[in-house]
Amino acid sequence: MRNWLKSLPINLKNQVLSLDGKRLRGVSNNEHITHLVELFATESRLVIAQEKVPDKKGERKALPSLLKSIDVTGAIISMDAHYTYKPELSQVLEAGADYIVGIKGNQGRLHAEIENYFTQAHAISYDSEEFECYTEADKGHGRLETRSVCVSCDLGWLGERESWGFGALIEVRSQREIKGKTSKEVRYYGSSRKGTAKEFARWIRDHWLVENGLHYVLDVVFREDDARANTGYAAENLSLFRRMAMNVIKAFDPKRGFEDARRSAAFEPAYLGGLLSKLFGARC
């Protein structure tokens, strides 16, 4: 799959690559766990790298291999707080990419300093060319969500900014209204890249496309969690084939839904042959 992906005219520069893990629940139990870590190109909607790890705790160890498997120069790799450690962030920068990473309690002091900074900035209505806010709203299916994204490139107060490689800090304040009930959440991020508040709003939002664009399709269309094959490398190999099928459909018939494409491939030999020819380079 890696060699085939390299042959595609994909431009990863400035594209958000969502790094996320997925446990194959159908073949996982207390004695046998199949856990995968993947890089998902959110604009191209392609799985561009995949590694098997023992469990979620082992996800960080897969990062060097993932970064070496494909050229990520100029891309933006988005990661959850599980990766908020200096060695991992340095690996991303050394690969020629930028990062956006969540900051939570696993970096307690850093999280507290950032939270305090943004709290004070709002309290005094901080006005600076290096501090900007942007608000957006989504409405649908009885839900209204409003997000306020504030970005600061004024990091002179942060003593370890250089060792972290931060170029910007981001605060996202979300308010959701569902069936008359309101919930609020505040999240913080660090990034090696500088950008506008509107750009960071899109980049952070794009990270979650891995849920609908990859995990949902695998679970609902390909029924991955219903698969039971776990002998040897069966689970890992079958997971790779599912992702290859997704990539072929998305790369060469992007306007067609996955369910429709699978049905056509099953009942229309010409359509199946066309897809396979794109994958193997010869008419089937």
What positions do the PLM features span?
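Conserved, well-structured functional cores that handle cations and Mg-NTP chemistry
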Residues: M1-M79, T84-P87, K255-G257
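Generic secondary-structure signature for well-ordered alpha-helical cores
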Residues: K6, K68, A97, T119, ...
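A residue-level signal for conserved active-site and pocket-lining positions in enzyme catalytic cores
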Residues: D20, Y99, Y189, E211, ...
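A short alpha/beta connector and helix-capping loop motif
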Residues: T34-H35, K86-K104
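Conserved PLP-enzyme active-site core in the AAT-like
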Residues: S69-V72, L89-A95, Y117
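An anionic, glycine-rich sequence signature occurring as long contiguous blocks
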Residues: K104-R205
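Short amphipathic alpha-helical "interface-anchor" segments enriched in bulky aromatics
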Residues: G190, K194-A229
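A short, flexible helix-boundary coil/loop motif
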Residues: V217-C284
